[in-house]
Amino acid sequence: MKFCKVVAIMNITDYNVLHEPIQRLDVPGVTVSMVKGFGDYVNNFSPFGFSDNMKLEIYTTEEQAETIAAELSSLADQLTEGGGVVAIEPVHQLMNVRKLDD
């Protein structure tokens, strides 16, 4: 089975728009990180033009990655000005690391 990582970088205020579709797609898990950067939107009131954004990372199967990326991209008309980006990255190996109870 092949795995991929779906990465979406969007304005931090758009989390409410993305939350429900992610739950509806029954993704195995999601990591949300706060990041700073600029793209189409440049914040002229902050150093380097950076604005506050969020980065979502979802590890999933190759098949489900296409569905997730398409769903996130379809929400573009509901997002804050400047939108964001969605990417699918191949994952060479995925290991679940956790402590097992004795």
Please give the residue ranges for each predicted region.
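Positively charged, small/polar-rich N-terminal and surface patches that mediate targeting and assembly
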Residues: M1-D102
